[in-house]
Amino acid sequence: TYPHLLAPLDLGFTTLKNRVLMGSMHTGLEEVANGHERMAAYFAERAKGGVGLIITGGIGPNTEGGTHPNTKMLVTEEDLVGHRQITDAVHAYDGKICMQILHTGRYAYSPDQVAPSAIKSPINPFTPRALTNEEIYKQIDDFVFTSVQAQKAGYDGVEIMGSEGYFLNQFIAARTNQRDDDWGGSYENRIRLPIEVVRRVREAVGEHFIIIYRLSMLDLVDGGSTAEEVIQLGKAVEKAGATIINT
């Protein structure tokens, strides 16, 4: 039995009605006609069923970070109107919903993909371009902008995707980060980017907004993080402003 599963969870500034979390997954509706309307109906049914917190499929923070060149982002007023359909539908059933921000890095199916180092993914025909120091700060700015847009759209929070080989995880893992500057080398340098993203997002959205950090507990590849390093990162992103750590 799970005696705490259906008990409320107090986050300090808001309370989840239970600890049931619907994890992020792509519905295939993000880029189709009437996609926002259909996603609103889809997520509303989950809220109606009593899920405490819903996380959407990944929304790209910029064009180079999307899963493919036509990935939906949250930029225009039209985008905001579409996403408000989703948040309004979930809130009508007393649900809470966070939008996942997914930067795919070298997993992007696009010749414009970027990463910490120019190391080709085994699942992708394209080789990423290694980011300059200035461009890394631009990526952080895009995470922040998208988080603020999500807040404007009525989301209760965002999930920052930092696991499973995607962009932030590519900086963390030594096998995909061969930089010799302040963003590479030591583990402290390699986790600098996700910490800075969380810190900057928290600074921008204020205290009364959920920030979930998606953390890889186990990389399952050579050159991945050790258990001690994962714990170190978890503590660091919590200190930087994460409300919830999701694995």
Where are these regions (language model features)?
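N-terminal amphipathic alpha-helix/helix-capping segment at the start of soluble metabolic enzymes
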Residues: T1-L21, V90, R199-G206
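N-terminal binding-site loop/beta-alpha segment at the start of enzyme catalytic domains
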Residues: L11-G12, R19-E37
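A broad, low-specificity signal for short, low-complexity segments enriched in glycine/proline
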Residues: L16-K17, G57-P61
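Alpha/beta enzyme core
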Residues: E30-H36, A40-G49, L53, G60-R84, ...
